[in-house]
Amino acid sequence: DYTTICDAGLVRQALTNLLQNAKDSLQEHHVAAPAIRISMASEDDMIAITLADNGPGFPEMDLGKLLEPYVTTRQKGTGLGLAIVSKIMEDHGGNMQLGKADGGGALVCLKFPIHTTTRNGKII
């Protein structure tokens, strides 16, 4: 078991935002059998939560630009969603990575630092 310290409300906001983005993209592109996969794993000293869909994926561009405020590739997008998620991750000492899922969809990986517990139960 691994432990991380986080603000549950902010992490919920981040996950909700990412799931909504995936849902919107799958609907806008009329994906026949839409799917969003969520997985969790430990990687080195981080806990990784990965969301992957089977939509068209991110556009061919510098994906880091999508994390900047007001940058959007969608007609009705504000360009704030991914920037907010990125800031939430930064505030938690973690990070967010964008990429391509197997099969070409969008992949987002949220990484939180692992905190270890001492024998007396304190988190360090």
Regions found by a protein language model. Give the residues of each.
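Conserved micro-motifs of the catalytic ATP-binding
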Residues: T3-C6, T73
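A residue-level detector for a conserved hydrophobic packing site
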Residues: V11-R12
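Short beta-strand-loop-beta element adjacent to the nucleotide/active-site pocket used for signaling
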Residues: P34-R37, A41-I49
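Acidic ATP/Mg2+-coordinating residue in the GHKL
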Residues: D53
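Short conserved segment of the HATPase_c
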Residues: F58-P69
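Short alpha-helical Gxxx[C/S/T] motif in the catalytic ATP-binding
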Residues: G81, V85
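Detector for a conserved hydrophobic position within an alpha-helical segment of the HATPase_c
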Residues: M89-E90
